């Protein structure tokens, strides 16, 4: 199939909510080693986001059930749950490794514009973060380090190439701050990053283009929601150092 035909099939698969097939179609486009259009880039991102998102949701539900069964002392159930969770983790690992290979071998090397470089390095950071979410020990440490390097690479380019109100720069700040909060357990750094991104965007709100107004303001709202949640968590931890360290899921 031609590039155009694969893009059409990806759109068709998206409409039919057959995201695995959407991934396959967009992988073929990515493997042409050409600069993707904004539309193609977004189709690729949506395809993988849906495929990984379903498994991430499954993993969270299974983990929650596992905790409940462990607290009840149901050893037989816990054994079955752990086996099932391993199956989901294998799927998560395969999907993450798949897109990371596409990014490393095709997309990052073929990207010419600052915008696309930020987009792809952000994606790289995201998928290493997803690996770190369920990994333990050394694999978690390695994934977290790789995620941090990718997010920093994206940030360095974003600061010089994209305005503070650009939705890709704001989306990067959102996800990078979530990484600090959830993976590195650094609420202060998470809050500082989110607040700086939000304040910088507010200061230049009058320069926001009509095209990206909706996307940018939505991400700014998510940054503010997370800040509200995280600052209250930090405040509670300071008030009660020996308290429960359960953390709410930040809005993303």
From Swiss-Prot:
Pfam families: 14-3-3 (PF00244). SUPFAM superfamilies: 14-3-3 protein. InterPro entries: 14-3-3, 14-3-3_CS, 14-3-3_dom_sf, 14-3-3_domain. It comes from the Eukaryota. One of its GO terms (cellular component) is cell cortex. GO terms for molecular function: myosin II heavy chain binding. One of its GO terms (biological process) is positive regulation of cytokinesis. Belongs to the 14-3-3 family. This is 14-3-3-like protein. It comes from Dictyostelium discoideum (Social amoeba). The lineage of its organism: Eukaryota, Amoebozoa, Evosea, Eumycetozoa, Dictyostelia.
């Amino acid at each position: 199939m031609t590039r155009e035909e694969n893009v059409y099939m990806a759109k068709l698969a998206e409409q039919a909510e057959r995201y695995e097939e959407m991934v396959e179609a967009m992988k073929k486009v990515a493997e042409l080693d050409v600069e993707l259009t904004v539309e193609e880039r977004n189709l690729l991102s949506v395809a993988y986001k849906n495929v990984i998102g379903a498994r991430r949701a499954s993993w969270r539900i299974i983990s929650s059930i596992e905790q409940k069964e462990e607290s009840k002392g149901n050893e037989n159930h816990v054994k079955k749950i752990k086996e099932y969770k391993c199956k989901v983790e294998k799927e998560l690992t395969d999907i993450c490794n798949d897109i990371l290979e596409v990014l490393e071998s095709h997309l990052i090397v073929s990207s010419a514009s600052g915008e696309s470089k930020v987009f792809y390095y952000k994606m790289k950071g995201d998928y290493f973060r997803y690996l770190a979410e369920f990994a333990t020990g050394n694999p978690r440490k390695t994934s977290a380090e790789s995620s941090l390097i990718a997010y920093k690479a994206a940030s360095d380019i974003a600061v010089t190439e994209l305005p503070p109100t650009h939705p890709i720069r704001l989306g990067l700040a959102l996800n990078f701050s979530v990484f600090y909060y959830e993976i590195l357990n650094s609420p202060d750094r998470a809050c500082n990053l989110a607040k700086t991104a939000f304040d910088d965007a507010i200061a230049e709100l009058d320069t926001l283009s009509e095209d990206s107004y909706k996307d940018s303001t939505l991400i700014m709202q998510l940054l503010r929601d997370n800040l509200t949640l995280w600052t209250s968590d930090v405040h509670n931890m300071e008030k009660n150092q020996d308290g429960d360290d359960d953390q709410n899921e930040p809005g993303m």
